[in-house]
């Protein structure tokens, strides 16, 4: 095999590959063995046609495509490795020369990983956020726990206040006409939650049970239903019931109800403080790492290939779809509800995708510049961690992953981030 790499504009180039005649002959032989099983000629059993007769009847050209299908998946990766390039998209293959008894020549037009010119990445001067947890933070968290344990109790008298839950009927009208989806009966709404159109909930404050009112609002310009967006509407509302939150006492009994591992409010308070400290620490760490990576990538010069951005966009869209599925929704329903098609979603994600790609390329370059390597022991430790997380034997994890090359690259990128943190 002979290989020639010609760099073209940007990150594109052409790989010219010559496969020796003997290797091409072997591929033709294998192609014949496959094709002959599907061909019938009078006087011969299927699969038993002599090679010479086959080529006389159909021509050797009938074997070329199958030979290429056998050859290219083997020879193209070899050529890539020999040329020392890292393609980031599928190659555009053109066969330049194909003839029985001769060498095969093909070209592959590909986009490769770009060169990274690193800027400053040490001493970036980014500090970690303060992770101090105050008594006020702890009390606010305990208050939130109280809120979550609150019971809704019917108010026998008094008017609607912020935070109350009202049970109401409503019907909406635009230009005097009722519209689809604008009517409900015995609907529970927490006033101040922002669940309804801006201005709707505010106008319920001060009403008493049994009250009726015309609530005048305007649909937001960006409202998902285009036929209602930006239009004024009137909702005829009737209040049936008003409920107020009744908070449990903040005492030892409350503490035991919240956490069976504690006996007193003091223990719950201490445990809450430690949990908040850990959460703040993790949040500050994540923010620091994100800011360092962003700054280092902003300082680097990289011509990011569109092919890499497109691949990242596809990955991000799949991640988004998985999150939707966890919420009981799918991408099709989301696009119908939001009025955005897949192309519009990708356009929204494009800037983040470009940042992700540039950040990853920068981290790979830092790992190379600083000679950061990943040992087999570190890979084994990561496999063990995954096995524990999924409650599976390590061998099963290894079989599922196959090659650990991608894991090594991921660990190397993590080491690059650790390096930024240590040398900030």
Curated annotation (Swiss-Prot):
Keywords: Cell cycle, Cell division, Chaperone, Cytoplasm, Isomerase, Rotamase. GO terms for molecular function: peptidyl-prolyl cis-trans isomerase activity; protein folding chaperone; ribosome binding. One of its GO terms (cellular component) is cytoplasm. Signal peptide: none annotated. It is found in: Cytoplasm. GO terms for biological process: 'de novo' cotranslational protein folding; cell division; chaperone-mediated protein folding; protein transport; protein unfolding. This is Trigger factor. It comes from Bacillus subtilis (strain 168). The gene is tig.
